[in-house]
Swiss-Prot record:
This is NADH-ubiquinone oxidoreductase chain 5. Pfam families: NADH5_C, Proton_antipo_M, Proton_antipo_N. It is found in: Mitochondrion inner membrane. Its EC number is 7.1.1.2. It catalyses: a ubiquinone + NADH + 5 H(+)(in) = a ubiquinol + NAD(+) + 4 H(+)(out).
Amino acid sequence: MNTIFNSSFLLIFITLMIPLVTSLSPKKLNPSPSSFYVKTAVKISFFISLIPLFIFLDQGLESIVTNWNWMNMGPFNINMSFKFDLYSIMFTPVALYVTWSILEFALWYMHLDPNINRFFKYLLLFLISMIILVTANNMFQLFIGWEGVGIMSFLLIGWWYSRTDANTAALQAVIYNRIGDIGLILSMAWLAMNLNSWEIQQIFILSKDKDLTLPLLGLVLAAAGKSAQFGLHPWLPSAMEGPTPVSALLHSSTMVVAGIFLLIRLHPLIQDNQFILTTCLCLGAITTLFTATCALTQNDIKKIIAFSTSSQLGLMMVTIGLNQPQLAFLHICTHAFFKAMLFLCSGSIIHSLNDEQDIRKMGGLHKLLPFTSSSLTVGSLALTGMPFLSGFFSKDAIIEAMNTSHLNAWALILTLVATSFTAIYSLRLIFFTLMKFPRFNSFSPINENNPMVINPLKRLAYGSIIAGLIITSNLPPAKTQIMTMSPLLKLSALLVTILGLLLALELTNLTHSQFKIYPTFPYHHFSNMLGYFPPIIHRLLPKINLNWAQHISTHLIDQTWNEKIGPKSTLIQQIPLIKLSTHPQQGYIKTYLTLLFLTLTLIILVVFI
């Protein structure tokens, strides 16, 4: 069994590496574009990854660990260690399936880009880094995958490097993620110094009697940076400056879920530390509500979907705080399908409307782009947790776990409100984009009759509909489920979703009777300005630092050193002596008479006394 798992994953890595290795050859091995090879390699890898998945589900195995010694440094060893358990074996096919669809869509979306082959290789490296992170069984190997997705996100977000906004967004992503990386590096240093090992299994065993609050805080900081939790979230909506396929891959199954996956993988360290669990719970609750609030008033179609991603990541962090990592992993898997489909639908709409992203300038697309409109509707309903779509199976389970837990009721209320907000902005997106009459230029090249558009959306739509049922049917519960529950608690998630839909319909009706150009609702600007985070963090703080630095340089260097201590001070001290010495040389008779009188007085005193 071990041989089959090792061979399958080795074959996956080899298949994914072939397009990268062949591109290093000075001679072209085949005149066909390498972008097709990348898509084909990911497709083949997906079917290979199904072999260990079916065997794993059939045999009911726990996990398989494979070690190869890499480096010896006295008592501290670094190994190449792969862990094939439920998380890695189930996540890998999901990531490959979603990436296959995104790459096929990118063949159509990026066909005019002169560097499309390099673009596809970057996406492939992005995927390989995520698979390395998911299958890693030691912290060093996990860190390689962690940094891999970080650097590839920088290259892909800033793909259109001639645009200032794209460069700024790429730098912003790197800086915010570097803050999180500091937490991961410090945690790894603490583990190496106190436990003398980076092997995850050994860390679980050796840390039984240790106080792990400090390294776990570092891990939470790392997850907050990579998964865009509150405080380190501004880079996620800014990342929409990259191409739409990048946004789809970034938000569905790679980088943004890496932070949550880190906490899932190391959850045995967290499960008994109440301080860290409470931190995750409160951080996730604030994140999911704040970002859902920001999504309510956005007009950029990609930013609405981006904030919905951040809100769902907050929901996953809440689930970590509830001590339910398997539910967080379930939501990662189901979320990947409909979130990738939402981004691909937005890319299809943007491409068809001459790169227009403002939903106020859309409308009436349900007749012009029927397949894209249907997919967008299915994805939005899955996002809201509509029954029997994939999002329902994970979101409903999370809300049930919160309702039946004895933990923070405040976090529960925030999460329920955020769930209602999810329904509001999802229906708002559908209403402005697909309904009513067209509000765009009639000369837009609207066309979705391309297999490279329809096939990816079709596959992701299938996943958004049935993936939740398939995964929950084969995912064994890690903890005892709640056997009895009142109907009100059972239906709470559905009730708040329906409440949000009704509220969204009421708000859309109010827009027709609004006579003032600017909204009169007092909190509109708070939501539309992203909680004033960008002005405060990116403008006010640098301005304060600049003014403080100028004040210090002016007062400390110019006034204190130059005027009170340095050259000017020396000059001022010499002025009285200079005046005293130059006074007798000015040619005044009274001065000469005074000197003569003093001289005669001294002579008389010396001679006669």
